[in-house]
Regions:
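Residues at the starts of beta-strands that form the adenosine-phosphate
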Residues: 42-44, 145-146, 216
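Conserved beta-loop-beta/alpha segment of the NTase-like Rossmann-fold superfamily
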Residues: 54-164
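N-terminal glycine-rich phosphate-binding loop and ensuing alpha1 helix
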Residues: 11-12, 16-64, 94
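Well-ordered alpha-helical segments embedded in enzymatic catalytic cores
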Residues: 28-32, 105-109, 207
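Short, small-residue-biased leader/transition segments that mark boundaries at the very start
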Residues: 1-15
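Catalytic-core segments of class I nucleotidyltransferases/pyrophosphorylases
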Residues: 118-120, 127, 131-140, 153-155, ...
Length: 260
């Protein structure tokens, strides 16, 4: 939730950051969080910066907007009664990591909130049907510092050079059509923070490149669905998948309301 983007969807992008652009009536960030929650991961740290106040306000009102309530203003009560809620049982920490901070610097700034445990990390503008539990199992099996999910997509992005599952280098797209790209959905060991310097550090160009050079970056090849949202065409495509009930990443069911 940290990328300053062009006006993706006209006026909508001018008032909110890309992760808060809605698909199917909810921010794409919410869809990503629902994916992780499906596999039991319900504690989130959001690296906010540009339009960070919008993200905080959205979560501040999340409980209210997902609950049936009565507002009683009679006799000067000014009372709010909550009857039932469809609230997700999450813990969400939103950190202002700065307006101009680069990706690596943003991750560095949340170090004290992460602690000394391995953690999951992804970008706030792409959805995927990768099986998170299998991704974690794979990461544990090789013992390296970092694992990223790699997909083969026709995207205008840098591609990965991989040997035996190990990411060796990053290259420009025109050098290798059909080569896998970094889709996010990473598992990172706390040692990753040693590769991050200051606010000018670009995670992909500095940390991941150094990890690849040292043989500490592995790839998890995903052959299923992945799609980022870089433009209006991709937003409309994701909207259509949700409207037709064909969104591969939407594994969760509607929650049963909790009566209070």
């Amino acid at each position: 939730a940290y990328e300053i983007s062009e006006c993706l969807v006209g006026a909508e992008m001018c008032i909110r950051d890309r992760p808060m652009i809605e698909i199917g009536g909810m921010p794409i960030l919410w869809h990503i969080m629902k994916e992780y929650a499906y596999y039991g991961h319900t504690e989130f740290i959001i690296c906010a910066g540009y339009k960070q106040e919008y993200i905080k306000e959205w979560f501040a009102n999340y409980f209210l907007h997902n609950s049936d309530v009565t507002f009683d203003y009679r006799n000067g009560k000014n009372e709010m009664i909550i009857h039932q809620t469809n609230m997700d049982l999450w813990k969400v920490t939103v950190i202002n990591t700065g307006y101009n901070t680069m990706t690596g610097g943003r991750i560095k700034r949340i170090q004290r909130y992460v602690g000394n445990e391995p953690f999951l990390m992804t970008y706030g503008d792409g959805v995927c049907d990768v099986e998170i539990d299998k991704l974690i199992e794979y990461h544990k099996s090789h013992g390296k510092f970092a694992t990223l999910t790699a997909v083969k997509m026709a995207q205008d992005k840098g591609v990965l050079y991989i040997e035996g599952g190990s990411v060796k280098s990053f290259r420009e797209k025109n050098m290798a059509d059909g080569a896998p790209i970094n889709a996010g959905y990473m598992v990172l060991e706390p040692r990753i923070f040693d590769y991050l310097t200051d606010d000018t550090c670009v995670f992909e160009k500095v940390a991941l490149t150094k990890l690849a050079e040292e043989g500490q970056l592995m790839s998890y090849i995903h052959t299923g669905f992945w799609q980022c949202m870089d433009n209006i065409r991709e937003k409309n495509m994701l909207d259509k998948l949700l409207q037709t009930g064909k969104a591969p990443w939407k594994r969760w069911e509607c929650q049963t309301p909790l009566v209070l």
